[in-house]
Amino acid sequence: MMIKNILSITAMLVAITASAQNDSLMNQGRYDYELSKSAWQGSNNAASLSLQNHINFGKAYFNYSHKGGDFYRVQEGDMNNRLQFFTESWQKLGKYLYAYGKFDFNTGRTKNRSWTDVMRPYNSNPYFSGSGIKASYEEQNINLTAAIGSVELMNGWRFGAKLDYNLGDLSRLRDPRSRSQLLNYKLTPAITYSTGNNIIGIAGWYNRRKEKISNVTTVDNTTKKIYYLMYGLENAVGSMGGSSGYQREWVNHEFGAELSYGYNNYNYNNMTVVSIARGSEGVYGQYKYQPGHYYTYNYAFKSQHRYRSSETTLHQLDLYGSYTEGYANEYRQQLVVTTDPSTGYNSYRYDNQLTYNKRYQVTLFDANFHYRFNKVANKEIPMFVGILASLKQVNNKYLLNTSTLKYSNVDVTLENGWNFSNIGFSTTIQLGYKNSTKSTLELADPSTDYAQNVLIPDMDILGASYAHGYLELMYQRPVSIKGMRSNWFIKGYGNLAISKKINDERLKRHTIGLSIGLFY
């Protein structure tokens, strides 16, 4: 039924675009050009959709991928097989509106994963749970984005709004069996004001994320298994049969705002954005038990530039930086049982006895640089060459007694792509190296189960420098189905990461995939 619905969505999108689009068939080179020419591409401000000057176009595909190898962290698992359907489209709706839509459905299975039953085990809320027994996990995710923006109205004003909606399901297939479900939505209204070639934009958003584990079950009740509750770094409490009656909810409310400025003309356009967001995430168990509360503050900067030095060359320069501070207040609570004397019924609640402010702390810093030189011909990009660089710094701390985990790395990648539209062939290659600049682990108690089975083994991965490469080959061919002519494609791709020697052995991680789809 799901596949039938997906095919119906694809056919509808193709039909809409075919009726509105009279230009030549979309191909990979033209697709790259449409996504590269405007600095406002990828903006969180939906009011900027009309600034991107897009024709009606999109793509849809099915994808299968396999990931494996021995270069992985404990909570990631060693192998993953995944099936995906993806489609996105840009459309002009009537005279006054532009729209963007995206639908992404994927399902997969991960093997030999342990020590986490939630979707965010790293650098986030520390109050999660898991089993130390390796198991397979099945997951399904649905990601929807819908954005609409007006043309310029009322002497320079544009208006828009965007909705992001995500559903997730993560199920453990071995005792103790958990099922984590995710509902995440984000609403972002936005406006821009233009005067001459200058554009100023404002956007604000509300993001609600709820992940919950309703129950943890067992099939084999003859043996009790240890289930762990985590509190940050090595601090995890395991109890025999601890999964019995376990339930937990993580509910986050985030408010954010961004201010953007852009300059727009044919030869040069740019967009610069600064943003700030605050999140407040409650953690709730049975009878509203709260092990703690997690807060985040995020500050981000993005600047994108597009410059045409001639009719046949287009330069892209993208800069991005983000700094996140998170901390958790840890609670000590006591169960209070109250009996109604008239009915004999009991009511339950937890009263807070003690609060450890900012007991767990995390800071994240990311900086990214991307430059790409594009050759342009007939509104296509037949060739590009570029360089990407990134810096990442992570710091986790748990207080009283103090434990820390710190790591950082620098990644430099070269890229090159060719689109031969006359024969329908495209290829992309990337070669890079990620250098580990720091990895330290200092634990107050390194003898705990979580330290011995997760943190200490992970340090080999976090401290490893490695080379990585990516290769993509695509073949495109026009196909007519019921009078609708579209460019169909088949794409094969793969990437490989090889580490420096760890204990006299080089670890490897690979991904291979195959996609079949169409441009429209």
Can you describe what each PLM-predicted range is?
Residues 24, 508-520:
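Outer-membrane beta-barrel "beta-signal"
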Residues 52-58, 95-101, 155-159, 196-200, ...:
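Outer-envelope beta-barrel architecture signal
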Residues 62-68, 105-109, 152, 165-169, ...:
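Transmembrane beta-strands of outer-membrane beta-barrel pores
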Residues 70-75, 112-118, 170-178, 213-219, ...:
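Outer-membrane beta-barrel translocator domains and adjoining extracellular loop/strand segments
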